[in-house]
Regions:
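Conserved N-terminal subdomain of the carbohydrate kinase-like
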Residues: 1-55, 60
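Short beta-strands and strand-loop turn motifs
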Residues: 19-22, 47-54, 80-89, 117-118, ...
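Conserved phosphate/ATP/ADP-binding segment of small-molecule kinases
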Residues: 62-137
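Short, small-residue alpha-helix embedded
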Residues: 87-88, 148-171
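Phosphate-handling active-site elements
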Residues: 138-139, 164-178
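Short pre-catalytic strand/loop immediately N-terminal to key active-site residues, enriched for Gly-Thr
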Residues: 138-151
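Charged C-terminal helix
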Residues: 172-193
Length: 193
């Protein structure tokens, strides 16, 4: 509900933020309010985890939200889409590492300062591969695939990046530290069910 979200943002007007991490923005109206808030807080690190893949969302809503999320790109330090989200943002199927690199270049050209596309195990059955691009060079981050049932890894990854940027790390350092952190958290997590 945009009205409730606006009230929540207003309740934070006296809070001095040092970093902002954005995740699921359920519709264009809420995203537009969040964008105005980000613009009003220029100068602090902003991490966008562009959540676009939800079971409840229809294609028309995804298309409109995609266009709205792209408006955030110039105001972010980094965007952190997973492979399906990167496909929606770049409007291209990503099957190979070269496809992912091309998508990262494209998303950077839309205003994102840095992009890390979380490829997971779709690019390689032996490793989890992420592709980082800052407009100058690519970095490929690999880790072993962990066979367990977890949720929230992408959100934790983006939040960790925001925390590391707040601590003064470069964007790539923040990504490296956060990938290792999330890997270890999953590796040492308890599995239930």
């Amino acid at each position: 509900d945009p009205t409730t979200f606006a009230q929540q943002l207003n309740s934070l007007k006296d809070v001095p933020f040092s970093a902002i991490k954005l995740g699921l923005l359920p519709n264009v109206e809420v995203a537009d309010l969040a964008l105005a808030y980000v613009k009003a807080h220029a100068g602090i690190p902003v991490v966008l985890d562009p959540v676009l893949v939800c079971k409840e969302t229809h294609d028309v809503e995804v298309s409109a939200l995609r266009d709205e999320l792209i408006k955030f790109f110039p105001y972010t330090n980094i965007i952190t889409p997973n492979l399906p989200e990167a496909e929606l943002l770049a409007q291209k199927e990503l099957r190979t590492l070269e496809d992912v690199k091309e998508a990262a270049r494209h998303l950077h050209s839309l205003g994102a300062k840095s992009v890390v596309i979380k490829g997971g195990n779709r690019l390689d059955t032996q490793k989890a591969i992420d592709v980082y691009y800052d407009g100058e060079q690519f970095q490929i981050l690999e880790s072993p695939i962990l066979e367990n049932n977890n949720t929230g890894a992408g959100c934790t990854f983006a939040s960790s990046i925001a925390s590391q940027l707040l601590l003064g790390k470069s964007t790539f350092e923040a990504v490296q530290i956060s990938k290792k952190f999330v890997y270890q958290a999953i590796q040492h997590s308890d599995q239930y069910g």
